[in-house]
Amino acid sequence: MKQAIGFIDSGVGGLTVVREVLKQLPHEQVYYLGDTARCPYGPRDKEEVAQFTWEMTNFLVDRGIKMLVIACNTATAAALYDIREKLDIPVIGVIQPGSRAALKATRNNKIGVLGTLGTVESMAYPTALKGLNRRVEVDSLACPKFVSVVESGEYKSAIAKKVVAESLLPLKSTKIDTVILGCTHYPLLKPIIENFMGDGVAVINSGEETASEVSALLDYHNLLDATDDEIEHRFFTTGSTQIFKDIAKDWLNMPDMTVEHIKLGK
């Protein structure tokens, strides 16, 4: 019987990481929990985000996952090190992989970071980037409207184009040549963001680099699954199963997926 990789996020954003993992590791089984009812996490204080992150973690650990991916930048910034220290399974977040990918891409060491208010205020990306390259200059920009655009399924709409243009205008006058999508919801807006920023700016989806790290860590711990046993992905949400399913089946190309509704907290 397969053991699943667990993924947690404040909503549907972490599906962008799941997609990259399943591209690289098609034999793996996924358990995903999106806390859509309490999304967004960005405006919440760190202690509350950490509490919510632990609630999601415990839910999936109780279901026997072999590894945990905190597929949410705000949750990674608030709780990664505490969870990693206390669990006896491998745990990774999305900030370090995204930082490494950006440093590979930049030519002038000027990097922009788009994130939620919580991620930007945590200084997690500048800390990670400067820890890897002291010469790098970082411009961080909170884009609080992006998550609601994605969660409402409007990420391909004219509304999305307007919100992106208004939000990213401050970055146009900078000399950045690389932008990190510092929230796992944002890759669903990547085509619009790339179009607005122009050809000279590389837009980094940390999901790809995170997937590579998942693969390496599973291999290191001898947890990779290469068997042809039946795969039973499970998707859980605290919010609307229909809205979650509409976005997830499109993004993951899983038309027959089932989404289960759960409750967390009090």
From Swiss-Prot:
Annotated pathway: Cell wall biogenesis; peptidoglycan biosynthesis
Active site: 72, 183
Function: Provides the (R)-glutamate required for cell wall biosynthesis.
Enzyme class of the recorded protein, top EC level: isomerase
Protein's name according to its UniProt entry: Glutamate racemase
EC number of this enzyme: 5.1.1.3
Keyword set, alphabetical order: Cell shape, Cell wall biogenesis/degradation, Isomerase, Peptidoglycan synthesis
One GO MF term attached to the UniProt entry: glutamate racemase activity
Pfam assignment, any one: Asp_Glu_race
InterPro entries referenced in this protein's UniProt entry, alphabetically: Asp/Glu/hydantoin_racemase (IPR015942), Asp/Glu_race (IPR001920), Asp/Glu_racemase_AS_1 (IPR018187), Asp/Glu_racemase_AS_2 (IPR033134), Glu_race (IPR004391)
Organism: Listeria innocua serovar 6a (strain ATCC BAA-680 / CLIP 11262)
GO terms of biological process kind: cell wall organization; peptidoglycan biosynthetic process; regulation of cell shape
Binding site for substrate: 9-10, 41-42, 73-74, 184-185
Reactions that this protein is recorded to catalyse: L-glutamate = D-glutamate
PANTHER family membership: GLUTAMATE RACEMASE
Family: Belongs to the aspartate/glutamate racemases family.
